UniProtKB/Swiss-Prot annotation:
Belongs to the RRF family. Keywords: Cytoplasm, Protein biosynthesis. The gene is frr. The keyword Cytoplasm applies. The keyword Cytoplasm applies. One of its GO terms (molecular function) is ribosomal large subunit binding. Transmembrane segments: none annotated. Responsible for the release of ribosomes from messenger RNA at the termination of protein biosynthesis. May increase the efficiency of translation by recycling ribosomes from one round of translation to another. It is found in: Cytoplasm. GO terms for cellular component: cytosol. GO terms for biological process: cytoplasmic translational termination. This is Ribosome-recycling factor. Pfam families: RRF (PF01765). It comes from Buchnera aphidicola subsp. Acyrthosiphon pisum (strain Tuc7). It comes from the Bacteria.
Length: 185
């Protein structure tokens, strides 16, 4: 029973880390990366299709992305989707390809982005702590129902705390890496 709580807690904490990682990966650092466009979808044959399924996204240089579109008829749809994506990108049609220059970040914008990612990191830490609280409550309920002993309760809560510290440390590492990436350029 306790093992199931530990496994479920680890899964939930891992999902929280993954969500945080995905969120900050979508933040532009002033450097070209295909992941910038991973959340772009276009209407293709009546359904929303990810951009990466209808094209190749290539990094031309550190400040330019190039999109090789498989079907010429959707080039303008892709351009429109990128313009409407709130990514502040200005795609340029060049034959059947789309060129996307990535603007350099100003110092002020970098500081704003760092505040945003620090806020996301704190929200993720709070989620991890809430997951810990939920797990500890389940363990206490098992003790109250006399399914486990007090020793098992203390051992389980120690494991949960170690797990919590581990995942908060992961959040801090991801945050530190992203801050360095933002300040590099």
């Amino acid at each position: 029973m306790i093992n199931q709580i530990d496994i479920k807690t680890r899964e939930r904490m891992e999902a929280c880390i993954q969500t945080f990682h995905n969120n900050i990966n979508n933040i532009k650092t002033g450097r070209a990366s295909p992941t910038l466009l991973h959340n772009i979808y276009i209407e293709y044959f009546g359904s929303k299709t990810p951009l990466r399924q209808v094209s190749n996204i290539i990094v031309e240089d550190s400040h330019t992305l190039k999109i090789n579109v498989f079907d010429d008829s959707i080039t303008s749809l892709i351009r429109k989707s990128i313009l409407n994506s709130n990514l502040d990108l200005n795609p340029v049609l060049q034959g059947k390809d789309i060129i996307i220059p990535i603007p350099r970040l100003t110092e002020e914008r970098r500081k704003q982005l760092i505040k945003v990612i620090r806020g996301d990191a704190e929200s993720s830490r709070i989620q991890i702590r809430n997951i810990r609280r939920d797990a500890n409550d389940k363990v206490k309920r098992l003790l109250k129902d006399k399914i486990i002993s007090e020793d098992n309760e203390h051992t389980s809560q120690s494991k949960i705390q170690i797990m919590t510290n581990e995942y908060i440390k992961k959040i801090d590492c991801i945050l530190e890496k992203k801050e360095k990436e933002l300040m590099k350029f």
